[in-house]
């Protein structure tokens, strides 16, 4: 395709109603997701009472979502604004260097979001196996898993793009170059299978933990053990909610992407329609905003449930020798506080 035809294609695709509407959708949702994710990180994720390992991983996951939303807002802001100031059709062609930076940044952050939930499953399995002593484990596993997963993602992306020169004419930051499309398609298949497998693994962890918790509490009745098992249960439920919401949106994106690439141009009737279908990118930006509300709702429900459990189950005896000791401790605590005041 010569440069004139590419300029015509860029013009036809850019001003296609569906494509244009999708660009506005992505830009608006990504722009809203940036402050929402930032506040969610500061107000909800950083103060979590979870173990340091899973807390570090959750912070890393939502931080990558935040950075991804920032890059989406910038790149799709470009797509929204540039068509308003062009003087020729060829002005819609993205400069190779700018495309390379935008494309690699978007691909890196979306694949990080896809690969990090595997670390949740690994950490939860280890936490379950070490339930008796996990509260005393140092925060090493979480950072180690994150660094390993980031390294794996970088290696895989290098494999995908190592032969890409980025010298073609590009009209969208999210359209994978033709020379890399087949390799990236295979990577999408791997990620889709892995996402489904990870979701199944999370469900199994919850089922095993439920049975393990019931059996274990009959043998160990100390408050510290009960607290640790409850903490593992709560964190596992929260990571499952995040993983399920993730697979709902990201899995849909992967499935649709694979479908479009598989059926090809013939299914859509023309190359323009095929390019528009590949360029519609709304499920992932929608997820970046939706996960904030899902996370807030899940944490609020878990906190309310935990408070109700504490109020209904935690009691201090007031009769017998144990009651007398509790009374003496309460009086001593009161007079100590008065003397300090």
UniProtKB/Swiss-Prot annotation:
It is a multi-pass membrane protein. GO terms for cellular component: membrane. Pfam families: 7TM_GPCR_Srb. Keywords: Membrane, Transmembrane, Transmembrane helix. One of its GO terms (biological process) is sensory perception of chemical stimulus. It comes from the Eukaryota. The chain crosses the membrane at residues 22-42, 66-86, 102-122, 141-161, 188-208, 240-260, 279-299. Its main location: membrane. The keyword Transit peptide does not apply. It is found in: Membrane. One of its GO terms (molecular function) is transmembrane signaling receptor activity. Belongs to the nematode receptor-like protein srb family. This is Serpentine receptor class beta-1. The lineage of its organism: Eukaryota, Metazoa, Ecdysozoa, Nematoda, Chromadorea.
């Amino acid at each position: 395709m010569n440069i004139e035809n590419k300029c015509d294609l860029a013009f036809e695709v850019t001003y296609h109603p569906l494509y244009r509407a999708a660009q506005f959708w992505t830009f608006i949702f990504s722009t809203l997701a940036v402050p929402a994710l930032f506040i969610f990180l500061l107000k909800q994720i950083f103060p979590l009472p979870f173990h340091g390992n899973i807390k570090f991983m959750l912070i890393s996951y939502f931080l990558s979502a935040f950075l991804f939303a920032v890059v989406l807002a910038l790149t799709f802001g470009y797509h929204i604004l540039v068509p308003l100031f062009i003087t020729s059709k060829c002005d819609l062609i993205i400069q190779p260097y700018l495309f390379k930076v935008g494309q690699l940044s978007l691909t890196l952050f979306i694949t990080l979001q896809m690969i990090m939930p595997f670390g949740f499953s690994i950490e939860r399995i280890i936490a379950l196996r070490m339930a008796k002593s996990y509260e005393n484990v140092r925060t090493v596993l979480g950072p180690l898993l994150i660094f390993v997963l980031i390294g794996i993602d970088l290696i895989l992306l290098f494999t995908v793009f190592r032969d890409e020169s980025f010298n073609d004419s590009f009209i969208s930051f999210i359209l994978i170059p033709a020379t890399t499309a087949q390799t990236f398609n295979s990577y999408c298949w791997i990620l889709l299978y892995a996402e489904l497998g990870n979701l199944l693994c999370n469900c199994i962890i919850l089922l095993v933990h439920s049975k393990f918790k019931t059996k274990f509490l009959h043998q160990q009745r100390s408050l510290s053990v009960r607290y640790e098992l409850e903490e593992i249960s709560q964190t596992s439920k929260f990571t499952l909610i995040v993983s399920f919401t993730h697979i709902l949106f990201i899995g849909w994106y992967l499935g649709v992407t694979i479908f479009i690439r598989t059926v090809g141009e013939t299914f859509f009737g023309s190359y323009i329609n095929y390019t528009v279908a590949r360029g519609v990118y709304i499920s992932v930006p929608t997820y970046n905003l939706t996960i904030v509300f899902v996370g807030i709702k899940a944490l609020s429900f878990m906190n309310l449930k935990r408070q109700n459990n504490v109020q209904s189950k935690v009691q201090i005896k007031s009769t017998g020798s144990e009651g007398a000791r509790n009374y003496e401790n309460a009086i001593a605590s009161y007079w100590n506080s008065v003397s300090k005041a």
